[in-house]
């Protein structure tokens, strides 16, 4: 009889609690003392390559956060008597190297099911490479994919998984109504206890190694240096939170937001804020890297509801987590269309390239204070409120008419909570490319409603510190005498094109190309053909949100 090695290939599931792969490894290890468990994480160079539009996809802030997540997982695994092997390179090569090759040996690779093409293509490459290596020595290698990133398990959702979720609604409300009425959230899977994963085998070397920023395959040495700097000292004092990666910090944040501060009980009223740590949960970065599962968050909310209070706020965090699920399943259904210029609806619109506008948007110098403040916050801290994201996305895509994928790329580079399905799904929707109505935000009115005194704007746009609230949405409209007195030095609003939204139609028949994907080419979830109809075009209208 040969040996059995179980490789836990951690990706966006950097936790021990409620992790189906970890639980499965513990079960396999309990079946025989000959089973050895090797937990591994790879900083895969694929994610660090520039996007199709030339922007480095993995930024310094996310580099720091991910290093912290991986370090925290390593510490937790060591506390159990196991460890985490950390590598940089290609997952395919690293995991193939871990494959046993002796006669009758078997290697079982456990990994979380992913929904987008780059990740699923990576699975296939790992599977192929490990099989080939095992076969060379008359051994065997298999991969098990375990679902784990959503609140509702894919096997429980009331949609046709076998047809690639072809009956999944393309808008949120019917999706939510169906999942809430038809399925239950499964129980949280307990974390393993000491020694359940056994000790890592002595034959595998390199467990003592943890990469530094300069070891990560960043697109440039400047990004690596910036990452190093962020680790060593410089938390911007205006950051909403000192985000530190890792499961222990994620669980501490859940505990704080629910039990220690009771902020959960007022979430509905505060969620549109932009300043401070507590207007929203700030769980997104940890959820994106899988340091905490949405199921754990919801089970804690349910406990809070039974022990403290149940109200609209406690429900609303669950509501938001269902949005997160929606975008995961939406990505699975539509495959690479979420990366295409004409989106999942196949809508044609006149997008343009304008380097001046794009640069102003990225650097927070558009002359629109709410946009500039949010964009500066993102670049400095890796975070932006949901209110801010809606506004800056609407401005870039719908007001400026810039190819919205440049915006999605920029977010991918900067956001600590970057999640492929949430980011590209939200951008595609914000650009009006998922079908249905188009929600264009009135930036001046949004400023008045959500930052009437300009407190948030002044935090990030220092040159507006002296501008009275009455002129905060458009400082250059202040009387000349006032502008001179305060020495206002802020750009005029960029001139933007007038856009005709009725032109956004969907072409009849299947997409004929020209949209140009943002990432890889695979189609993991399949897709439905575009049905460009007059009714659909007629349903497109410009809602200016107040
Ligand atoms: C253009 C654009 C891009 C976005 N990109 C991302 C992204 O890459 N990663 C990401 O996690 N969120 C993304 N969002 C969604 C949302 O803005 C963030 O999840 C939220 O602001 C994070 O703050 P929070 O954790 O305090 O959220 P809370 O308000 O506390 O909400 C709780 C959780 O619900 C989930 N959630 C809330 N709103 C959404 C939403 N619209 N879509 C998906 N999940 C949601 C998040 O996991 C969040 O942590 C994007 C939104 C827009 C408009």
UniProtKB/Swiss-Prot annotation:
Location(s), subcellular: Plastid, Chloroplast; Mitochondrion
Keyword Plastid among UniProt keywords: yes
Cofactor binding annotation: Binds 1 FAD per subunit. Binds 1 5,10-methenyltetrahydrofolate (MTHF) per subunit.
Biased composition (Gly residues): 511-525
Cofactor: FAD; (6R)-5,10-methylene-5,6,7,8-tetrahydrofolate
Region (Disordered), start-end ranges: 497-546
Gene3D superfamilies: 1.25.40.80, DNA Cyclobutane Dipyrimidine Photolyase, subunit A, domain 3, HUPs
Domain (Photolyase/cryptochrome alpha/beta) ranges: 4-151
Signal peptide, first to last residue: none
One Pfam entry name: FAD_binding_7
UniProt keyword annotation of Nucleotide-binding present: no
Record keywords: Chloroplast, Chromophore, DNA-binding, FAD, Flavoprotein, Mitochondrion, Plastid, Transit peptide
Disulfide bonds: none
Principal location: plastid
NCBIfam families the record matches: crypto_DASH (TIGR02765)
Family: Belongs to the DNA photolyase class-1 family.
Purpose of the protein: May have a photoreceptor function. Binds ss- and ds-DNA in a sequence non-specific manner, lacks photolyase activity.
Protein name as catalogued: Cryptochrome DASH, chloroplastic/mitochondrial
Organism: Ostreococcus tauri
């Amino acid at each position: 009889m040969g040996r059995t090695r179980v490789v836990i290939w951690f990706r966006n599931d950097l936790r021990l609690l409620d992790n189906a792969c970890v639980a499965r490894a513990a079960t396999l290890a309990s079946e025989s003392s000959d089973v050895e468990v090797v937990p591994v994480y790879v900083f895969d160079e694929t994610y660090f390559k520039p996007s199709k539009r030339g922007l480095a996809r993995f930024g310094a802030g996310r580099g720091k956060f991910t290093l912290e997540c991986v370090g925290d997982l390593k510490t937790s695994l060591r506390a159990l008597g196991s460890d985490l092997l950390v590598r940089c390179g290609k997952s395919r090569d690293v995991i193939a190297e871990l494959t046993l090759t002796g006669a009758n040996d078997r290697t079982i690779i456990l990994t979380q099911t992913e929904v987008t093409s780059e990740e699923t293509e990576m699975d296939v490459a790992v599977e192929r490479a490990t099989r080939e290596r095992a076969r060379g020595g008359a051994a065997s290698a298999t991969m098990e994919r375990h679902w784990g990133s959503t609140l509702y398990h894919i096997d429980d959702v009331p949609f046709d998984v076998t047809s690639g979720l072809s009956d999944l609604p393309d808008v949120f409300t019917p999706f939510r109504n169906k999942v809430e009425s038809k399925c239950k959230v499964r129980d949280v899977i307990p974390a393993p206890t000491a020694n359940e994963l056994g000790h890592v085998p002595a034959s595998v070397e390199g467990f003592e190694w943890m990469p530094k920023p300069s070891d990560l395959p960043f697109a440039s040495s400047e990004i690596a240096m910036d990452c190093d700097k962020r680790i060593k000292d410089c938390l911007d004092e205006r950051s909403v939170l000192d985000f530190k990666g890792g499961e222990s910090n994620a669980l501490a944040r859940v505990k704080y937001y629910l039990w220690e501060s009771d902020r959960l009980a007022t979430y509905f009223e505060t969620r549109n804020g932009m300043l401070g740590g507590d207007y929203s949960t700030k769980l997104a970065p940890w959820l994106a890297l899988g340091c905490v599962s949405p199921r754990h968050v919801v089970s804690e909310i349910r406990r809070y509801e039974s022990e403290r209070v149940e109200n609209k706020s406690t429900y609303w965090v669950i509501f938001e987590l269902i949005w997160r699920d929606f975008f995961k399943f939406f990505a699975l259904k539509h495959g690479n269309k979420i990366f295409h210029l004409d989106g999942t609806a196949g809508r044609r619109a006149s997008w343009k390239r304008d380097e001046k506008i794009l640069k102003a948007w990225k650097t927070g110098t558009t002359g629109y204070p709410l946009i500039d403040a949010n964009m500066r916050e993102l670049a400095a801290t890796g975070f932006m409120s949901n209110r801010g994201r809606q506004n800056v996305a609407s401005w870039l895509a719908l007001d400026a008419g810039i190819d919205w994928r440049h915006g999605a790329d920029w977010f991918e580079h900067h956001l600590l909570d970057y999640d492929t399905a949430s980011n590209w799904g939200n951008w595609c929707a914000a650009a009006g490319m998922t079908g249905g109505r188009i929600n264009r935000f009135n930036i001046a009115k949004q400023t008045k409603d959500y930052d009437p005194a300009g407190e948030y704007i002044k935090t990030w746009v220092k040159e507006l510190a002296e501008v009275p609230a009455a002129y905060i949405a458009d400082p250059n409209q202040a009387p000349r005498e006032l502008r001179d007195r305060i020495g206002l030095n802020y750009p005029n609003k960029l001139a933007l094109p007038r856009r005709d939204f009725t032109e956004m139609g969907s072409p009849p028949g299947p997409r004929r190309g020209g949209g140009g994907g943002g990432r890889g080419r695979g189609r993991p979830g399949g897709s439905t053909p575009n049905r460009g109809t007059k009714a659909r075009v007629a349903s497109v209208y410009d809602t200016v949100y107040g």
